[in-house]
């Protein structure tokens, strides 16, 4: 017998035609690249806490997690960028701690009718003001307008001309709900009515972060390529870093799940630099935003996670720079990080964003990895695209080997077996690796085939005759990050002489 049949017996005598299926050469499946968002749900919501829940729409998130909840808002922002991709969520248990509060104090009687425009995050809340309105009346109208929008992250109460805004959840993330008056200003036809004075005290006082240990357990061994979390405190990220590690975590050989964590932090340059210096993990990207950014940090996380998901699913090696964070309001002009400040952030493990024509965009999604085990500067894992490319390459190889050689015998090179036999040799596997590399080269994932082939090693293990050891040395295609040009001008070229 030459051809290897998985099930048809070699001694079959019953006539006549017998066929079996073999799909080993047909697999062309690509990973769906599912995403995961971690966030808080309202205490009276119906969603199960610390359980994986698939989330196809923002409407469903509002229904099960509660409108205005952190999780519902994150899903809404995510779906604004990625309406198609597979999305899962985990609703975490609210932490022990305090609830963030902010105030809007109104003074002076209105001397003209108009509209008060208060921005809570990226959402504008408007209250009508009539000539002669006292602060108490204006405050009551503003509080009513806030409470009329169930999708806001805060509730409002008015007393003696002061509107107190209270976050819907306890915890640190409530401090990062920005408040602003007339974001677009006079140019955008936003003006405070004459006679009305408004003083805003930013959201503050929120304390506590949820324990993510149960959350991580709920993730199980389900693959998630893009994991968004608004909890950027050290303890929360340490828990996720442990889950992502290269030894026993999602990037370890025994699990092979891969994925990347996206989080964000709002702060001054010095605060963000100090924050970046506390981390050194290639599987986490922490984006830094200016104190004046007019979008809640949890929504920024969801937007950035979604934008990466959309881009990386299409091409893991293509840079995510310029990706629009749809619906986010950037810090006003004059309050944004300068080029020098952005450079400092990128030198300290903080991913950056920039604003162009009022649109907030990804500038560079670096990881927090900065130094090797000896504390020496190391740029091998600088960009998150490198990690996504690595996952893509490994999955491609795994798909080929597990599809084409699931039940093969192993022999030495030069063994004279008949055609059709389910036997593989190191040389055959090396050819398979080279063919796969060529395919990925045409797809723009890798480069330098000749050098790759020169350094590729495929050999039988000297101690275990059933094992093949492979040294796979891919050269990843890089991203165009910097275009440097020296404009060496002339006033006029001299004519050449014969």
Task: Name what the model sees in each region.
Residues 133, 158, 206-214, 418-425:
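Surface-exposed ligand/attachment interfaces on beta-rich extracellular proteins
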Residues 108-112, 116-120, 184-211, 219, ...:
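Bacterial flagellar/type III secretion structural subunits and associated motility module proteins
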Residues 136-143, 213-216, 237, 241, ...:
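Extracytoplasmic/secreted envelope proteins and their assembly/folding machinery
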Residues 119, 173-189, 486-489:
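Extended Gly/Ser/Thr-rich low-complexity repeat segments
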Residues 36, 79, 83, 122, ...:
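A glycine- and small-residue-enriched flexible loop/hinge signal that marks low-structured segments
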Residues 1-86, 321-326, 332-334, 339-344, ...:
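Structured, hydrophobic secondary-structure cores that serve as assembly/anchoring elements
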Residues 57-63, 109-178, 227, 246:
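Extended, beta-strand-rich, solvent-exposed assembly scaffolds of outer structural proteins
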Residues 97-110:
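Disulfide-bonded cysteine-rich modules in secreted/extracellular proteins
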